[in-house]
């Protein structure tokens, strides 16, 4: 028997089984032990292949692909620390719901814990973070092919959200010509090879059902909190809230158009808190709220009823409100809970929001970080999308901007790490093929610098704005010890990104005024490929501007 040949037959069944569950994108890192999986993926015409030399970035690339495609994305890596590098993306997927299928090649059992090279204990390496985990045996014809496909089908069929880790040991030899070894074993699956259906089909049901007392509650005074959702859902929610006459507090990821902009500013005003305290019901649609004042209000509000609707299962309310946790897609839930036309009840809130917006506009004239966040709408590409980084960037955009309703916005706001942001944005662009604007801070860019290699393959104009405020200025908003802040929190690196862009053959601009930024953006959207635009700003101006506006709005 040819071991290398049967390894490939076994791997071919694995990859083919995944196609029956909607896997179309496969992300592959170089490696020897993963050869059977890599060759099987390469030979399967159902797949779109993506490659990257860094497994951590590869995992985030897959995450971005899954965000847009709404389908599971497979990742193939070799054994050893290559596997561990997938951990950050896996954790994020578990919190935000994207489906990742991690195919990790492994040494066979006899090479574990005996000093063999590149051999670590891979089963269970991700602890409780995967939604599902499989540790396959080494390939053998003693195990029916039907067992292999049914095992994979069961795991994929029960995967509602998050990652599936499939550990795949392969013995050597890994290379050699493909011969007839294992053909009969594969053929026992019969006409499964010609079909497009799983061997074992699972029925899944996701629907909370209509709340029977909705017709009662929709006549009450309500508030809508909009968290992370799709662009289409964001437009629906905005119309639904308008019909009900309820104030809508929209997060930057809600894509609702934020009809009451600057919520994270005006919620610091006592008048707003007093007005909203009259609410009898709060309905939160989507999780992962960003703004600090929004989260503070969410945690302290005391309505008669608090409903939280999200397709993700589990507890998603860190304030632990008494109420209802409803598992459903937001679109389906809105369809089951129609709005009734009513007059707006919180009449002071729109005026506070308008005053906060006007004040922000008046004070965001100079060239800077907070000012860019306020103006970001004018730099969005037509028929495009926005990817927002973490730390200070997302907070400024959430607090100071007003994005178009239904305009696609993506981010990694599950674990909210600064690792893998550029890689994720690259995946978002590849899956959508749309023009893409991504904005991150300088430390985030440094953390994922080799992901600039992925941007060379952008299929539409891609603009990466790096806001260089020389360190982690988010800590300027926190009561960190002044004497230790720079050394242990901000950690300024005093770098510029011109040579990084050149190393990866990306176009580069460093504008120093609004007119120069306008010209750079206009040029970038007219050209194919990726452009890195670096905004060098005064270190703490963005954080200070936010604090200044908060103080002013609180006294309106």
From Swiss-Prot:
Signal peptide: none
CDD domains assigned: TPP_PYR_MenD, TPP_SHCHC_synthase
EC code(s) of this entry: 2.2.1.9
Cofactor(s) for this UniProt protein: Mg(2+); Mn(2+); thiamine diphosphate
Catalytic activity: isochorismate + 2-oxoglutarate + H(+) = 5-enolpyruvoyl-6-hydroxy-2-succinyl-cyclohex-3-ene-1-carboxylate + CO2
The protein's annotated pathway: Quinol/quinone metabolism; 1,4-dihydroxy-2-naphthoate biosynthesis; 1,4-dihydroxy-2-naphthoate from chorismate: step 2/7; Quinol/quinone metabolism; menaquinone biosynthesis
Cofactor note: Binds 1 thiamine pyrophosphate per subunit.
Protein name, per record: 2-succinyl-5-enolpyruvyl-6-hydroxy-3-cyclohexene-1-carboxylate synthase
Superkingdom to which the source organism belongs: Bacteria
Subunit organization: Homodimer.
Pfam families tied to this protein: TPP_enzyme_C, TPP_enzyme_M_2, TPP_enzyme_N
Keywords: Magnesium, Manganese, Menaquinone biosynthesis, Metal-binding, Thiamine pyrophosphate, Transferase
Transmembrane segments: none
Organism: Enterobacter sp. (strain 638)
GO biological process, one term: menaquinone biosynthetic process
Family: Belongs to the TPP enzyme family. MenD subfamily.
Group of enzyme by EC: transferase
UniProt-recorded Gene Ontology molecular function terms: 2-succinyl-5-enolpyruvyl-6-hydroxy-3-cyclohexene-1-carboxylic-acid synthase activity; magnesium ion binding; manganese ion binding; thiamine pyrophosphate binding
Task performed by this protein: Catalyzes the thiamine diphosphate-dependent decarboxylation of 2-oxoglutarate and the subsequent addition of the resulting succinic semialdehyde-thiamine pyrophosphate anion to isochorismate to yield 2-succinyl-5-enolpyruvyl-6-hydroxy-3-cyclohexene-1-carboxylate (SEPHCHC).
HAMAP family from the UniProt entry: MenD
């Amino acid at each position: 028997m040819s071991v290398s040949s049967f390894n490939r037959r076994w791997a071919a069944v694995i990859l083919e089984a995944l196609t029956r569950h909607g896997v179309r994108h496969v992300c592959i890192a170089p490696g020897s032990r993963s050869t059977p999986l890599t060759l099987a993926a390469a030979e399967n015409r159902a797949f779109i292949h993506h490659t990257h030399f860094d497994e951590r970035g590869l995992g985030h690339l897959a995450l971005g692909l899954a965000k847009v495609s709404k389908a599971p994305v497979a990742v193939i890596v070799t054994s050893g620390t290559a596997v561990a590098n997938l951990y950050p993306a896996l954790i994020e997927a578990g919190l935000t719901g994207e489906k990742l299928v991690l195919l990790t090649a492994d040494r066979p059992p006899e090479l574990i814990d005996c000093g063999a090279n590149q051999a670590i204990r891979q089963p269970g390496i991700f602890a409780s973070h995967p939604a599902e985990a499989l540790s396959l045996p080494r390939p053998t014809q003693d195990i029916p092919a039907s067992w292999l496909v049914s095992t994979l089908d069961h795991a994929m069929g029960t995967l509602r959200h998050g990652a599936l880790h499939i550990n795949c040991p392969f013995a050597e030899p890994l290379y050699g010509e493909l011969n007839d070894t294992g053909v009969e074993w594969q053929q026992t699956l019969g006409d499964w090879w010609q079909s497009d259906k799983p061997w074992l089909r699972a029925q899944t049901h996701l629907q909370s059902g209509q709340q029977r007392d909705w017709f009662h509650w929709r006549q009450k005074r309500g508030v809508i909190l909009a968290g992370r959702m799709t662009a289409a859902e964001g437009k629906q929610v905005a119309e639904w809230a308008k019909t009900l006459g309820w104030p809508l507090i929209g997060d930057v990821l809600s894509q609702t158009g934020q009809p009451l902009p600057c919520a994270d500013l005006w919620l610091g005003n006592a008048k707003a808190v007093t007005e909203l305290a009259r609410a009898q019901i709060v309905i939160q649609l989507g999780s992962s709220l960003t703004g600090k004042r929004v989260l503070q209000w969410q945690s302290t509000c005391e309505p008669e009823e608090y409903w939280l609707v999200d397709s993700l299962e589990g507890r998603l309310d860190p304030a632990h409100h008494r109420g209802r946790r409803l598992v459903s897609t937001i679109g389906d839930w809105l369809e089951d809970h129609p709005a009734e036309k009513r007059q707006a009840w919180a009449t002071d809130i729109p005026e506070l929001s308008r005053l906060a917006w006007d004040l922000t506009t008046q004070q965001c004239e100079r060239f800077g970080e907070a000012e860019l966040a306020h103006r970001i709408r004018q730099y969005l590409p037509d028929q495009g999308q926005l990817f927002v980084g973490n730390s200070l960037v997302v907070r400024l955009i959430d607090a100071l901007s007003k994005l178009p309703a239904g305009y696609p916005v993506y981010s990694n706001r599950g674990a909210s790490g600064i690792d893998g942001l550029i890689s994720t944005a690259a995946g978002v662009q590849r899956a959508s093929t749309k023009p893409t604007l991504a904005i991150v801070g300088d430390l985030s860019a440094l953390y994922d610098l080799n992901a600039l290699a992925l941007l060379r393959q952008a299929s539409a104009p891609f603009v990466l704005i790096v806001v260089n405020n020389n360190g982690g200025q988010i800590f300027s908003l926190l009561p960190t010890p002044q004497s230790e802040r720079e050394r242990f929190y901000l950690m300024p690196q005093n770098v510029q990104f011109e040579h990084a862009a050149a190393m990866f053959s990306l176009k580069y601009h460093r504008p120093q005024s609004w007119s120069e930024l306008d010209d750079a953006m206009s040029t970038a959207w007219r050209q194919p490929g990726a452009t890195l635009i670096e905004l060098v700003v005064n270190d703490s101006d963005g954080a200070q501007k936010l604090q200044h506006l908060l103080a002013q709005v609180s006294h309106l």
